[in-house]
């Protein structure tokens, strides 16, 4: 994506004019400017410089009386499903952007691009060409919080004609696009890379992300990069110092890719370098260790009533604080964990903190691998559940045996059945879920592809309200996930408290015994597998549809897994009934159950 199209050119513009413009703007280019009637093409050294040219010149520079437009040059055959959206308000919530994009079709992937501009840039992959075309037409020039969006095609490698054998190899890659929110990434591997689908990927590592005061960045890099090279060699790590991010900011992020031991060793060396530089420059303020962690993992790091964090503080003799949820924006899905103490205790605290974060990540990967098998085709990375600094969720087949290999999926082309789930939320949270004039619940419904209704309160003193969600499994996953997230964002659960909600699903009364199992065996296995509390209340009177309630209580992943496993049991019961009916109709004797 380093080839540029320069449009809206005057007839008088020459290659020399464009060369001078790029040189004045300090944007390097390779080769010659190919000037046609009213437009031109040129190559930049890499994608970063191409983005810089677009940010600096497009719509901002006049040449021979005309304001030029600069965008990625995309061959017609590759103008398919991928768009780049620029000039997004920097403090826009993901939820708003998601709902806007979803109005024009199914979004498979949405990833932020690092730029030096104040506004945000994302690359979006729609499910098909028509959705992308509508998105381009409707969103280009769209006014969002006084910012005018700029939308262009970017090359879709998967649109390039291929041999049938190549297409077969690459289909799994399409189903598992790279991580959705690419904060701090240098860009994912191309989805069309030869052999990418056939070659197994290594287990994804969780890098260590630090914040360091800007004045110490030079000392960490060293003369001509000597110090940083020495650190990487000593610790067998790859270290990225994001100097261009947040120009003028007092702190800069550093990403360390290595084994847990390598990350910790590099972190300790960096702390020692900063301390020495502070002494040499008579810098008297305390320099705490600041670790960046994706918000999804912070609740588990803190633990119930803050127990995990208190234990780390006591064991390492440090003082640890975590930035508030309100600081999270489109640019920043990470919380800052500040550790105060001398170098040795801080280094020990880093090890314990990252150990907890890695455990949470691995647990989520395991849970989501199971989820991916239970909801075929579900694009988990598109929901933003994983930290951007990792490469997203690996395909379920990589290194993890399918725990549900016997699951029967709907026939090809058949839509998954709609389900109804009752989710109970704090009564005080109803306003936040509905939003001003119902805007939030409408956006959520569109994004998830589900019907979402709030049931009337059971009484004036009711502490809980029931949210009725109707839709297929993927819609349930999206809608429930967003509701869990909204409750945490709006502080209906404390900063040291994990969001656990009660969910009710109805099952036919004749199938309740299958959910419970002999002597409660099935329900106990369900609870062990999912970490959710699953209860089928005894002595229930079936409703008018001959159904009874199964109650599930747990955090989001636990609840989702329990719901999927119960639906799987119900599907098995239905299949057996259908088989028995066919057998009865054909007059054949029924096979004896073992």
From Swiss-Prot:
Source organism phylogeny: Eukaryota, Metazoa, Chordata, Craniata, Vertebrata
Protein name (Swiss-Prot/TrEMBL): Insulin-like growth factor 2 mRNA-binding protein 3-A
Residues in KH domain copies: 205-270, 286-353, 418-483, 500-566
Originating gene: igf2bp3-a
Compartments where found: Nucleus; Cytoplasm; Endoplasmic reticulum
GO terms under cellular component: cytoplasm; cytosol; endoplasmic reticulum; nucleus; ribonucleoprotein complex
Notes on the domains: The third and fourth KH domains are involved in RNA binding and self-association. Stable self-association requires RNA.
Pfam families: KH_1, RRM_1
GO process terms (BP): CRD-mediated mRNA stabilization; mRNA transport; nervous system development; regulation of translation
GO MF terms held by the record: DNA binding; mRNA 3'-UTR binding
Membrane-crossing residue ranges in chain numbering: none
Keyword flag Ribosomal protein: no
Native source organism of the sequence: Xenopus laevis
Subunit annotation: Homodimer and multimer. Associates with microtubules. Interaction with a translocation machinery protein TRAPA of the endoplasmic reticulum. Component of a mRNP complex, at least composed of DAZAP1, IGF2BP3, STAU and VgRBP60. The mRNP complex with DAZAP1, IGF2BP3, STAU and VgRBP60 is only found in the cytoplasm. Interacts with a hnRNP 1 related RNA transport protein VgRBP60 both in the nucleus (in a RNA-independent manner) and the cytoplasm (in a RNA-dependent manner). Found in a B3 activator complex.
Residue ranges of every copy of the RRM domain listed in the record: 2-75, 81-156
